[in-house]
Amino acid sequence: MKDLRQLASACEAELRAIGIRPGRVAVWKVNSRAKSRWGQCRELSPGCFEISIAARLLQDDTSDQAAKDTIVHELLHTVKGCGGHRGKWAALAAQVNAALPQYTIKRTASAEEKGLTPDPPAGRYLLRCSECGREFPRERQSRLVQHPERYRCGVCGGRLKRVR
């Protein structure tokens, strides 16, 4: 497994080299339970942050760059005024992408973009379009799950069928 602190230090140095001053990160965590996000930045107290990174990004068979993209993404959230993904955060992400071409900082990234195999669709229930084959995983037994015949595929208009 890659050393998160070493990667984070390298990322912070690269940001500082292009004039971006990230906030103070008090806690770096490896999140082994993360399934639907690559990283998370939480403000513990004003100006003090906790960043967690998905364990999948730190595995030996994953590229360093995949992890560093996420680390830089989260470090940008520590800059004052960069809580969301618009405005100042988006401008800083564009600055990083222009100054450091090895980075691709954006709001979201798929497993394929990170060089990982995607997880199979999660969910206790699975519906499938009879026309295009698109799958709709669901965790809750919603009306859609209970009565798929009342609904249509949003892509092609085909009928939905509950698979599991």
Ranges and model annotations:
Residues 74:
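Walker B catalytic acidic pair
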Residues 1-69, 78-164:
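Active-site-proximal or metal-binding-adjacent scaffold patches in catalytic folds
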